[in-house]
């Protein structure tokens, strides 16, 4: 069977629980960013130090780089999807098996050589002070194929989500140059729209018409799952993945739009087709009640 290409859409109901998926041991306290690059396609930060172990990993995997993906709009920009939900952006943390292989280049030749951790970015009303450390460096790499020292104190641990349950599957790197085991945290970290928009001001390597272009988007669309591809999950991942505030807000907006549509039908048919108008206004009342109870529950969850 051909290798599963990445990224993919993760269907939570089809993910398989695996007792071997223990919590990861993440040791980023000694990781230090050395350089930040505009590759013409994405932003990459190279690291020295830091590793992951534990969980289902046979040994330590050393942190190599951080890569960031985004879209033209704040509503979409992640490579991976959770139940067809696309987040605002995605961070990929690339690690390699230093104990078994002599270099990153050697490790990428093997299916147990690379581990990539995926962290979703979700636009919210508040700036992320830790993510801002990266945003502050972007002016130094605005031109394509440029690199600069990362000249700020930066603690990668601060970009980890609040919940570390995860999905995992065997796929490939985003550019399909190597096999990779993916570890995907479904709980996103929040950033502000202004922070994400800064990435869209970076110049791209594309200049087919002789004019400068910007990296307005660089995410990949998901690939279809192979018949033999298995996606596993740990802990309470299904519940965590399906109750995000962003998902609930989107659903509430959809219900609100549907209510307005029903009310417009009521106004349109009240003088003519009274039966249709009555059905429409009944739906308005039902949707209003649903929205009220959802907003009450959401308010209580925020307070807790």
From Swiss-Prot:
The UniProt keywords, alphabetically, are: Disulfide bond, Host-virus interaction, Late protein, Membrane, Transmembrane, Transmembrane helix, Viral attachment to host cell, Viral envelope protein, Virion, Virus entry into host cell
InterPro entries according to UniProt: CA_dom, CA_dom_sf, Carbonic_anhydrase_a-class
The cross-references to Gene3D superfamilies, in alphabetical order and at most eight, read: Alpha carbonic anhydrase
> Which BP terms does GO give this entry?
symbiont entry into host cell; virion attachment to host cell
The Alpha-carbonic anhydrase domain is annotated at 1-235
Q: Which residues lie on this side of the membrane: Virion surface?
A: 1-275
Q: Name one GO cellular component term.
A: membrane
State which ranges are Intravirion (membrane side). Answer: 295-304
Q: Where in the cell is it found?
A: Virion membrane
Residue ranges of the TM segments: 276-294
Domain of life (superkingdom): Viruses
Q: Name one GO molecular function term.
A: zinc ion binding
User: Induction of this protein: by what?
Assistant: Expressed in the late phase of the viral replicative cycle.
Keyword Transmembrane helix listed? The answer is yes
Q: Which SMART domains match?
A: Carb_anhydrase
Regarding how it is modified after translation, the entry says:
Apparently non-glycosylated.
Q: What is its main location?
A: virion
Q: How does it assemble?
A: Homodimer; disulfide-linked.
* Protein function: Binds to chondroitin sulfate on the cell surface to provide virion attachment to target cell.
Q: Which PANTHER family match?
A: CARBONIC ANHYDRASE, CARBONIC ANHYDRASE 7
Similarity comment text for this entry? Belongs to the alpha-carbonic anhydrase family.
**What is the official name of this protein in its record?**
Cell surface-binding protein OPG105
Task: Report the source organism.
Answer: Vaccinia virus (strain Ankara)
Q: What is the lineage of its organism?
A: Viruses, Varidnaviria, Bamfordvirae, Nucleocytoviricota, Pokkesviricetes
């Amino acid at each position: 069977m051909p290798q599963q290409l990445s990224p993919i859409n993760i269907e939570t109901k089809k993910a398989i629980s695996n007792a071997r998926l223990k919590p990861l041991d993440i040791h980023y306290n000694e990781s230090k960013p050395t350089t930040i690059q505009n590759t013409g396609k994405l932003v990459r930060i190279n690291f020295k130090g830091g590793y992951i172990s534990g969980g289902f990993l046979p040994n330590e995997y050393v942190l190599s780089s951080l890569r960031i993906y985004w879209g033209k709009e704040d509503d979409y920009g992640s490579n991976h999807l959770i139940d067809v939900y696309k987040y605002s952006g995605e961070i990929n943390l690339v690690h390699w098996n230093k104990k078994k292989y002599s270099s990153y280049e050697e490790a990428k030749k093997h299916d147990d050589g690379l581990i990539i951790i995926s962290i979703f970015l979700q636009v919210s009303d508040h700036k992320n002070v830790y993510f801002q450390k990266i945003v502050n460096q972007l002016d130094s790499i605005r031109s394509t194929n440029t690199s600069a020292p990362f000249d700020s104190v930066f603690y990668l641990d601060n970009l980890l989500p609040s919940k570390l349950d995860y999905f995992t599957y065997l796929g490939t790197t985003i550019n399909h140059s190597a096999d990779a085991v993916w570890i995907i945290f479904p709980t996103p970290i929040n950033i502000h729209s202004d922070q994400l928009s800064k990435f869209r001001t970076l110049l791209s390597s594309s200049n087919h018409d002789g004019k400068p272009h910007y990296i307005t988007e660089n995410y990949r669309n998901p690939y279809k799952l192979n018949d033999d591809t298995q996606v596993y999950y740990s802990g309470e991942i299904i519940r965590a993945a399906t109750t995000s505030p962003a998902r609930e807000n989107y659903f509430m907006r959809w219900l609100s739009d549907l209510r307005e549509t029903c009310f417009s039908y009521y106004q349109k048919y009240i003088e003519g087709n009274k039966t249709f108008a009555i059905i429409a206004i009944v739906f308005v009342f039902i949707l209003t009640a649903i929205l009220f109870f959802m907003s009450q529950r959401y308010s209580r969850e925020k307070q807790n």
